[in-house]
């Protein structure tokens, strides 16, 4: 039975993010890494999240926190609304909205993630969360104000 990839690509999981999460392939760019990391959150795969965090970030120390978070979070969807990178610079950025339910309340992570390429592999470094006013347009592209969309 085939299942669509949780990353929102509308492609079957086995043909989309599974090869990266399973370790069969290395994500070719920051957008694929971002999408596969989202899948790892959905599928509660702390090993993949830690493996794809840059080693300088000390992600292994976050394992217990990641696993505890899995128990309380249901991921609802991912929208990638901007991505840019240059292989020559070995740095890339992906902006996204990840929607979830936690403790019975809906929420969203709106982030511009930073990625670094080392030895042919992209790694997540960190992310910044832009500040939006409640009446600003939602960055997901819905056309709604943030207070009526991802900022609820």
UniProtKB/Swiss-Prot annotation:
Domain of life (superkingdom): Bacteria
InterPro entries referenced in this protein's UniProt entry, alphabetically: NTF2-like_dom_sf (IPR032710), SEC_C_motif (IPR004027), UPF0225 (IPR023006), YchJ-like_M (IPR048469)
Pfam families, sorted: SEC-C (PF02810), YchJ_M-like (PF17775)
Classification via PANTHER family: ADENYLATE CYCLASE-ASSOCIATED CAP C-TERMINAL DOMAIN-CONTAINING PROTEIN, UPF0225 PROTEIN SCO1677
Sequence similarity: Belongs to the UPF0225 family.
Protein name (record): UPF0225 protein YchJ
């Amino acid at each position: 039975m085939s299942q669509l990839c949780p990353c929102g690509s509308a492609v079957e999981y086995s043909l989309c993010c599974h090869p990266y999460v399973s370790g069969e392939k290395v994500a070719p760019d920051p957008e694929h890494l971002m999408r596969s990391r989202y899948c790892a959150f959905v599928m509660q795969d702390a090993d993949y999240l830690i493996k794809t965090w840059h080693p300088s970030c000390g992600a292994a120390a976050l394992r217990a926190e990641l696993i505890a978070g899995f128990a309380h979070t249901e991921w609802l969807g991912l929208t990638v609304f901007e991505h840019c990178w240059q292989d020559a610079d070995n740095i890339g950025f992906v902006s996204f909205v990840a929607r979830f339910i936690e403790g019975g309340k809906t929420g969203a992570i709106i982030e511009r993630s930073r990625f670094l390429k080392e030895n042919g592999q992209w790694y997540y470094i960190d992310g910044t969360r832009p500040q939006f006013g409640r009446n600003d347009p939602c960055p997901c592209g819905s056309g709604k104000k943030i207070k009526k969309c991802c900022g609820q």
